[in-house]
Amino acid sequence: VKENESHINVRDVNDGYYLRLYEDEVNLIKDEAYSHMIKEITTDAGVQNVSDISINFDPLYESLTIHHISVWRDGKQIDKMQKNAFKVLANEKDLAMFVYHGSYSAYIILDDIRKGDRLEYDYTISGSNPIYNKKFASSHYFQGTEPIGQIHYSIIAPTTRKLNFKSYNDAPQPDIKTTGSATLYNWDLGTVAGAPNVSNAPAWFDPFQFVQISEYGNWHEVAVWGYNINKPNDKPNGLLGKRISELQEKYGTDTTGLFRAIVSIVQNEVRYMGVEMGPYSHKANDPCKVYNQRYGDCKDKSLLLVSMLHSVGIKADMAIVNTDKIKIEDYLPSPLSFNHAVTLAHVQGKDVWIDATIAGQGGKGTNIYFPCYSKALILSPATTDVIATPEKHGGEIRYTEDYVTGGDESKPVSLTVYTIFTGNKADDMRTYVADQSKAELEKSYQSYYTKIYPHLESTDSVAIIDNKEGDTLETIEKYVITDFYDRDNSNHEYSADFYASMISRQMPQTDNNKKYPIAVAYPYKIHYTVHVISPNGWTIPPKNERIFRDAYHFSCDLETTGNKLSIDYELEYFKDNIAPKEIAEYANDRKKITDDLLSFSFKNSTDAGTSSSTNSNIFTAVVPVVIVISLFAARIYRARRNRDRNRWY
């Protein structure tokens, strides 16, 4: 395509360069895709960011041809094409998530790149994944967070192939021209402004202009395609067949017990690891192979589970979902709308959803937690549409700190921390504990607290009480603190302060003018309680606060009984986002909660007995177990969110 004059304001450019031209041409007749880019360097930082080229391809079914690499400087073209300088490197960006794709990158480092240069290069990738049976589906974005000088996108297709198009966020429509036996779909855009950065938005929120293209006419076509490449093995042999026979003999007519035993085997005895080369991006390996090797990705484990259940007479189907919870029902039918495989079983008249990639799940029989994945497509010839998955309430975290004081600053304070996890929170914690040594777990807990109380010491090993059938897990920590109080020598008073940061950290900051939803943890429910026992007694009036909204609930209760002070907090979210129309109200609620309701201090005087008061903005008493769970949840969230939609893991 001919390059147009760019109208980019360099004040809007980050990273020291911008795309002056971004061109993609897909030729379905030749089964190839041509790409052409021009990057203009505006600052010295751009030199660092533009001086290498990396092009991804899968050698199992694709071939790469690089046509030109040039630098334009002072109106003159400098040839930078050095084929021998290219290195072909394995590109396993998802290996840390235990997924191996077998894809590669052609990589070159360019010399003598300067501020003001324009780097231009183009290449063609021929071939496509055979798993799609020559059926085309894709999405193309016309907008990013940075401005782009010019965008050209086109598709050349035989007139015999019907392509369906759908535009999102006011994306432009194609110009369509038919010549002979070929149809050209063409988009040509001038300068495109960058879209606003949408930090803290839920994963499903996509504000960018894009077009979806799909050759699939309906969801039935997608379901049949997925079923045909992932048919269950109803009569497994070898080691798997032997294991199934042993289970049938053990459980007899106990169908529910047999079901849960099979689920446990697939979840806990077959580790998560995906080798997704070529067609195995969407096709599962044979269940007997997966069981023998004791590893597999989501579709491997799902098909293994379905096959084992079928072999004992329990009906089950493989299903595909999107872990970002995108509104699949609003999308064109396509396999690319999904990134994860799960299972739907029918056990004694009850529908039970299972994610076979989750290890360590508690509960008994059919009582098993299933994440909120929104919509699913059952891989069955009978499927006609996507269906809703159950919106189950998650588990809870109940966190209690018990402080027993001696009445004056000279006496040590004992601290006992009780944390009870239920449901999926227990599942998460169970996995975390299994990944850590007991010594490391105790070290991390005590290390955290010593940052608040430098002279804190552990008085006992951390107790872990796991009731797997009841799906609860409890931890108990015990410490002694010799520097609990802060002393004010001017008035002979000493004080102690608390702040419920585990509540505030789950309430993201925002302003009243956000035009897009804000992501919050969901499902999420936490109870946080502080007990302080003092022989001096308490003279604090009770306090009760309640905030009920459509998206969340918060409560705070303060009371005293004899020598015991109790402060109880509760926070629960009812959905995964704060809608734009709710943001102003949420921002006001958050300010009130974090400024006025989460902190408490008390003071004792060595001269005049005891006095107590509430206060705010004191110090942060963070809970290490909550930190652990938050970090663990974030790791899983990122791992799932960053998945390539061209694969099912």
Where are the model-predicted features located?
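Cytoplasmic C-terminal tails of single-pass
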Residues: 641-649
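Cytosolic-side junction of a single-pass transmembrane alpha-helix
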Residues: 632-640
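A sensor for short, sequence-defined functional sites
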Residues: 1-633
